Every structure is written in structure tokens, then in C-alpha cells.
């Protein structure tokens, strides 16, 4: 069983560095494509300020020149979902579960264990980067599938942009999750609630050592309860009262 989570734009480098691993062939090809951009071109590519573009340019060049500092990916990313994941003070069993089951899907590094070394970078599958004439999704599809081909059960906490990198065959093994808020009988979904809930849900999976869909259905976390009436075999819905 594997649990998939996406990367995040926000990063926190206030952690001890760890040793880098050599970039895999697919990652090197992506980096080579990114390295063609000047800082001013990155401003347009990323749709960010000149200052942010300079920062990203420095990140790319540092990776290219093997100067980049690397951090455990789960600690490097610091978006809303990540801030709601239990990342410190884990028991030995929780640490083992995290290492064995949680994978991060990256447009630069591929599908990798959650504590793999990553350098600060900004890239997702909505960005129109061409790698050897292919889109990012096409470039990564076979490697993404390969990472999960032996898995019978996959819990996906990904957004659709990441899920659609995988083939239909792999996606059919995925159990997805929806987190909703009940406001006076009206069920609402919004980004902030979903991101926080994904982090809290992953924490519950880790703490309870969940291995099956049946175990996942029994979880209660951050005010969320499983709603069988709204769920299906491959989509579990959890609702909290507003």
C-alpha cells in the first residue's frame, strides 16, 4: 500500500541539510530544459515577480552546478497541507510507516519516498515546460507508472494535475478522498479546508498505521467523520461540521 502526496510551492529551508542523491535521467532532462531559461524568461514562465524569478534562477543554477542544498522533502515543503502533517516527534513505528508507505510526486524528481533529498525548486504539471519535445506529463508517465506498478492499493491525496500523469490502469487502483464542511446542512468544499484536511488525514493514517480501506473508513480526525452515504468504493468522503 502506498500513499501519494503532491509537492507544494511554499518551502522552508530552516532544517539541517542532507546528502544529495544523483539525479535520475528523467530529472536531469527536466533540469536541462529549465536551465535554458534566463531569469527574465523565468519571470514570464512562472508568472512571478522579478525578485522571485531571480531566486528560482539561482535554485536552478545551483542544482545544475551540484551546489544546491538538499533537505528531506517532507520537511522542505511547507504548504498548508504539509503544515498539518505530523513531521516531528514521530514514534519509531510512525517513522517506519512513513518511510514504507508515503511517496511524494514531483515534476522534477518523480515519485519518491517522502524523506528523499530534494533541493528547493518550483515546478508543477500545470507549467508548460517542454522536455525533449514532450509535455512534463508525457515525459514522466512511464516512470510514474513504474513506481506503482506492483502496488494493489494506492491512497491518493493528489490533485487531478498530478493524478492524470498516471495511466488509466494505475488510476483505477487509486482510492481518492474528499473532505467537506457541513454549513447548516449545505455541504461545501474549498481549497483551504481540503489542504488542511489532507495533512490531518495523513497524520491519522500514520498514527493509526492504516493499511486497508476499511481501516481508513474508521478514522476520525480534526473534526472529520466518514460519510458512507456520500462515499463509493474508490472515493471516501469525510465531513466536518462548520
Identify the function of each model-found stretch:
Residues 2-6, 153-156:
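Short hydrophobic beta-strand segments
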Residues 4-89:
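Active-site helix-to-loop segments that bind/position phosphate- or nucleotide-bearing substrates
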Residues 86-242:
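Internal, well-folded beta-alpha domain core
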Amino acid at each position: 500500500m502506498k500513499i501519494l502526496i503532491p509537492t507544494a510551492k511554499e518551502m522552508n529551508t530552516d532544517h539541517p541539510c542532507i546528502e544529495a542523491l544523483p539525479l535520475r535521467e528523467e530529472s536531469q532532462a527536466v533540469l536541462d530544459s529549465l536551465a535554458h531559461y534566463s531569469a527574465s524568461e523565468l519571470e514570464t514562465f512562472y508568472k512571478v515577480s522579478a525578485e522571485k524569478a531571480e531566486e528560482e534562477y539561482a535554485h536552478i543554477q545551483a542544482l545544475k552546478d551540484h551546489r544546491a542544498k538538499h533537505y528531506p522533502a517532507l520537511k522542505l515543503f511547507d504548504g498548508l497541507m504539509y503544515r498539518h502533517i505530523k513531521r516531528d516527534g514521530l514514534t519509531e513505528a510512525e517513522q517506519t510507516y512513513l518511510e514504507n508507505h508515503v511517496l511524494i510526486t514531483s515534476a522534477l524528481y518523480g515519485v519518491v519516498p517522502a524523506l528523499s533529498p530534494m533541493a528547493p525548486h518550483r515546478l508543477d504539471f500545470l507549467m508548460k515546460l517542454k522536455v525533449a519535445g514532450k509535455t512534463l506529463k508525457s515525459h514522466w508517465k512511464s516512470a510514474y507508472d513504474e513506481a506503482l506498478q506492483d502496488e494493489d492499493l494506492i491512497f491518493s491525496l493528489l490533485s487531478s494535475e498530478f493524478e492524470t500523469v498516471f495511466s488509466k490502469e494505475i488510476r483505477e487502483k487509486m482510492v481518492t478522498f474528499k473532505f467537506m464542511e457541513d454549513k447548516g446542512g449545505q455541504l461545501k468544499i474549498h481549497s483551504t479546508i481540503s489542504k488542511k484536511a489532507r495533512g490531518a488525514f495523513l497524520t491519522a493514517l500514520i498514527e493509526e498505521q492504516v493499511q486497508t480501506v476499511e481501516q481508513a473508513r474508521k478514522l476520525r480526525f480534526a473534526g472529520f467523520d466518514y460519510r458512507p452515504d456520500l462515499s463509493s468504493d474508490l472515493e471516501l468522503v469525510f465531513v466536518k461540521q462548520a
